[in-house]
Every structure is written in C-alpha cells, then in structure tokens.
Amino acid sequence: MFSHIIVGAAHGSTLYVGDMLFYAILFIVLMALIAKFAWGPVNAMLKERADRISNDIDSAEQSRIEAEKLAKQRKEALDNSHAEATSIINNAKDSGAKERELIIGNAQNEAKSLKDKAKQDIEQERADALKSAQDDIASLSIEIASKVIKKELDENSQKDLIDSYIEGLGDSK
C-alpha cells in the first residue's frame, strides 16, 4: 500500500490526491476506533496505575510517619528508662548513705554505752576497793590501837572511831 508512495517519491512522481484522501480517512477511522474501543481501557488502565502509584506513595508516607512515631516512642521509652535507672541508682546511693549513717550512729551509741558502763564498773570497783581498804585499815588500826593502849574497846566503837579518823584524813587532802 505504501510501496507505491515510496517508489513514487524515489522517482520524483507526485502523490495521488485520491490516495492521500484514502489515507486521511483511514487515519480518522482508525483514530475513531482506537478512541471508541482502546482509549477507554487504556485510559482506565493508566488511571488505575496512577491511583495505585498514588496509594503506594500514600502508604509509604503513612508507613514513614508510623516509623517516625515508633522511633520517637522508643526514644522516649529509652530516655524514661535511663531516667528511671538514674533515679534508682540515686535512691540506692541515698539509701546506702542513710543506712551507713544509721549504722555508724548505732555503733557510736553502742561504743559510748560500753564506755559509760566500763566507767561505772571502774568506779564501782574503785569504790569497792576503797571500802575494802577502809575496812582493812580499820581492822588493822583496831589491832594496833588495842595493843598500844592495852585496852579493849568494843568493835563498833572502835570502827566508829577509826572511820571518823579516816574521814578526817580524807578531808584534809
């Protein structure tokens, strides 16, 4: 069909108007058929593809937003866990310091109590030793006095006499 056009163009001959008219009508009919039967489905396919691409883009955007939201939540959870861990550590340190102070205070109180009890025991032992020494001195003095003055005093009178003498010595110091 086109061969005579090509051959004619090569030989320098002119185109036939009838052929051109035929080709123009054929082109218009072909375009009408394409518009009637193929253009709708092709257009629908292109619209469907554009919608699918748009939906994919929207879905990807939504997924990106959700991923950012999850990342933000995880970061907040991580920050909260770091803050909570820091709080727990600080509370443990404070609790340990308070416990240490309590233990030290109790140990100091117990040491003071033991020291006071030891002082009381020492004072009691000293008083007992002093009383025992006074009794021994009184007995010894009675023996010496009875030998010196060669007379016997009853034991209570002698003790009173010696105690008053010892107290007099204690006051003079």
Swiss-Prot record:
In terms of HAMAP family, this protein maps to:
ATP_synth_b_bprime
Recorded protein name is ATP synthase subunit b
State the function annotated in the UniProt record: F(1)F(0) ATP synthase produces ATP from ADP in the presence of a proton or sodium gradient. F-type ATPases consist of two structural domains, F(1) containing the extramembraneous catalytic core and F(0) containing the membrane proton channel, linked together by a central stalk and a peripheral stalk. During catalysis, ATP synthesis in the catalytic domain of F(1) is coupled via a rotary mechanism of the central stalk subunits to proton translocation.
The organism encoding this protein is: Pediococcus pentosaceus (strain ATCC 25745 / CCUG 21536 / LMG 10740 / 183-1w)
Query: Where does the record place it?
Result: Cell membrane
- Which key words are in the record? ATP synthesis, Cell membrane, CF(0), Hydrogen ion transport, Ion transport, Membrane, Transmembrane, Transmembrane helix, Transport
Cellular component terms, GO, for this chain's entry? plasma membrane; proton-transporting ATP synthase complex
PANTHER family annotated for this entry? ATP SYNTHASE SUBUNIT B, ATP SYNTHASE SUBUNIT B', CHLOROPLASTIC
Q: What is its main location?
A: membrane
How this chain assembles, per its entry, is: F-type ATPases have 2 components, F(1) - the catalytic core - and F(0) - the membrane proton channel. F(1) has five subunits: alpha(3), beta(3), gamma(1), delta(1), epsilon(1). F(0) has three main subunits: a(1), b(2) and c(10-14). The alpha and beta chains form an alternating ring which encloses part of the gamma chain. F(1) is attached to F(0) by a central stalk formed by the gamma and epsilon chains, while a peripheral stalk is formed by the delta and b chains.
Q: Which family does it belong to?
A: Belongs to the ATPase B chain family.
